[in-house]
Design a protein with these regions (language model features):
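A short, conserved alpha-helix within the catalytic core of class I
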Residues: 108-120
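Class I SAM-dependent methyltransferase SAM/SAH-binding core
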Residues: 33, 41-89
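Conserved beta-strand signature within the Rossmann-like core of class I S-adenosyl-L-methionine
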Residues: 127-136
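Core SAM-dependent methyltransferase catalytic element
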Residues: 178-200
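Conserved Class I S-adenosyl-L-methionine
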Residues: 143-167
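Class I SAM-dependent methyltransferase Rossmann-like catalytic core
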Residues: 1-29
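Conserved class I S-adenosyl-L-methionine
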Residues: 28-38
């Protein structure tokens, strides 16, 4: 029997709304780096729907085999095999005009979030766009009871995880040369945060 591909039901539910965001903000882009491709479901869906984009997948080493299963089945010419990417380095020796990451900032440690944003000036071209999807707090408050419960679950699983404060993340983004372009409400109490890389 062929090896079963990894599958996450939330990816199936949110891929449509996220694609609407990407169609707008990645219009005219050429090369996108996905940080934390996870199961690979998002990459296949977005690369298939956006054939003008070269979509580079990445994740930690243990997740690469599952991503390859999705990519090998899809056979999309614009979807690239995953590269190992740990936010603490090394990063790909390449530049991109789009970066996408979904449901990663609340999983990695805050030190990891800082490392991710610190690396962006070398990775994201001037005028490039970062799209980050996931739940966030505002003014220190959760946007829903379900997000508060999810945050508690995250912290029980790993003390370093947790839903991040939008204001703190945006300040971090600004310190890396990014300007907030849009904060879009998404289904299931998530957000799509879009930043643009300022010129030097």
């Amino acid at each position: 029997m062929p090896e079963a591909k990894p599958h996450a039901e939330p990816c199936e539910r949110n891929k449509g709304p996220i694609l609407e965001v990407l169609r707008q903000h990645f219009a005219g882009r050429r090369r996108v780096l996905e940080i934390g491709s996870g199961t690979g479901q998002h990459a296949v869906h977005f690369a298939g729907a956006l054939p003008g984009l070269i979509w580079q997948t990445s994740d930690l080493e243990p997740n690469l085999a599952g991503i390859r299963l999705w990519i090998d089945e899809a056979r999309l010419p614009n979807l690239k095999p995953p590269v190992v990417l740990d936010v603490f380095g090394p990063w790909p020796d390449a530049q991109f005009d789009g970066v996408f990451t979904a449901n990663t900032l609340h999983i990695m440690s805050w030190t990891g979030v800082r490392a991710l944003f610190a690396a962006l000036p070398a990775i994201l071209e001037e005028g490039g766009v970062l799209v980050a999807y996931g739940p966030f707090k505002y003014d220190g408050a959760f946007t829903s009871a379900s997000n508060a419960a999810f945050d508690g679950w995250l912290k029980r699983r790993s003390a370093h995880s947790g839903i991040r404060d939008f204001e703190t993340v945006d300040a971090l983004a600004q310190s890396s040369g990014l300007t907030l372009l849009e904060d879009r409400p998404m289904p299931a109490n998530n957000r799509a945060l879009i930043w643009g890389m300022r010129g030097s």
